[in-house]
């Protein structure tokens, strides 16, 4: 089960005045900065901020909008035309959050992995590479493609095991094209009741800024942090030491 929104981090913190100096590090002229695989936001030396890294795999049928979602979450220009990803593409997304209990600020670094469906069918190692040391999986479907929604259960069963320690969230794309929807709200509600997974909705061609991506990025951050804290407590590590030994660093 997922963590209730706002139970661990401050919801809508991106709207609060005290978040501006942190969000300014991922913005340039009111647009999101583009970060390469080896880049990170620059912070003043006196402001020690913990950076936590996570690998996130985007799963879904061809045409549901995996590449578009990655671009949207990173604040990049959305693809003007559809093309199938020929191999594996990675996109880096930085997102600051404030923990409710301690007031501590964390910078999350999400490395989004997107692989074309045809490539995964042709080369078995593609899926294995995407799943290797993965922390979270976003299962995508399109509101305009009933088949992609019906395929969700197959995706989840094929890609994950009940014993996997991985955060699972579902994203419905092209939600703004309601005139052409093939998936009803009752369908979504029934799916959530059966699988216990939250479903997030994103639009099609137009990006609406931080407010549009905040619910999904906050949910990713909240569930991943909770997962790590639970894992740490199971081996008697204090929550303050829950920063991942192999993937945490201080931004300077």
Curated annotation (Swiss-Prot):
GO BP, sorted A to Z:
cilium assembly; exocytosis; protein localization; protein transport; regulation of exocytosis; regulation of vesicle fusion
Write down the PROSITE patterns for this protein, in alphabetical order.
RAB
MF terms per GO, please? GTP binding; GTPase activity
Cite the residue spans of the region called Small GTPase-like. 46-252
Instruction: Give UniProt keywords alphabetically.
Output: Cell projection, Cilium, Cilium biogenesis/degradation, Cytoplasm, Cytoskeleton, Exocytosis, GTP-binding, Nucleotide-binding, Protein transport, Transport
Per UniProt, GTP binds at: 62-67, 173-176
One Gene Ontology cellular component term attached to this UniProt record is: ciliary basal body
Known InterPro entries for this protein?
A: P-loop_NTPase, RSG1, Small_GTPase
Q: Where does this chain mainly localize?
A: cytoplasm
Annotated signal sequence is none
What are the subcellular locations of this protein?
A: Cytoplasm, Cytoskeleton, Cilium basal body
Into which family does the record put it?
Belongs to the small GTPase superfamily. Rab family.
What this protein is reported to do is described as:
Potential effector of the planar cell polarity signaling pathway. Plays a role in targeted membrane trafficking most probably at the level of vesicle fusion with membranes. Involved in cilium biogenesis by regulating the transport of cargo proteins to the basal body and to the apical tips of cilia. More generally involved in exocytosis in secretory cells.
Q: What is this protein's record name? A: Ciliogenesis and planar polarity effector 2
- Which species is this record about? Danio rerio
Q: What is the lineage of its organism?
A: Eukaryota, Metazoa, Chordata, Craniata, Vertebrata
Q: Which gene encodes it?
A: cplane2
């Amino acid at each position: 089960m997922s963590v209730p929104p706002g139970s661990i981090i401050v919801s809508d913190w991106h709207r609060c005045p005290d978040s501006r100096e942190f969000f300014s590090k991922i913005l340039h002229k009111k647009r999101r900065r583009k970060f390469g695989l080896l880049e990170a936001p620059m912070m003043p030396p006196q402001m020690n901020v913990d950076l936590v890294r996570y690998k996130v795999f985007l799963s879904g049928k061809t045409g549901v909008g995996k590449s578009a979602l990655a671009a949207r979450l990173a604040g990049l220009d959305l693809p003007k035309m559809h093309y199938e990803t020929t191999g594996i593409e990675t996109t880096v997304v930085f997102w600051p959050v404030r923990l409710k209990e301690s007031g501590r600020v964390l910078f999350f670094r999400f490395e989004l992995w997107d692989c074309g469906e045809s490539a995964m069918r042709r080369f078995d190692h593609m899926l294995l590479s995407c799943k290797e040391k993965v922390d979270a999986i976003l299962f995508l479907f399109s509101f305009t493609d009933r088949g992609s929604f019906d395929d969700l259960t197959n995706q989840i069963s094929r890609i994950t095991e009940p014993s996997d320690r991985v955060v699972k969230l579902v994203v419905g794309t092209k939600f703004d094209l309601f005139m052409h929807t093939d998936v009803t709200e009752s369908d979504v509600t029934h799916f959530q009741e059966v699988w216990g997974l939250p479903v997030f909705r994103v639009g099609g061609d137009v990006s609406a800024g931080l407010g549009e991506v905040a619910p999904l990025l906050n949910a990713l951050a909240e569930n991943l942090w909770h997962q790590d804290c639970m894992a740490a407590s199971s081996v008697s590590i204090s929550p303050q030491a829950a920063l991942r030994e192999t993937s945490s660093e201080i931004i300077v």
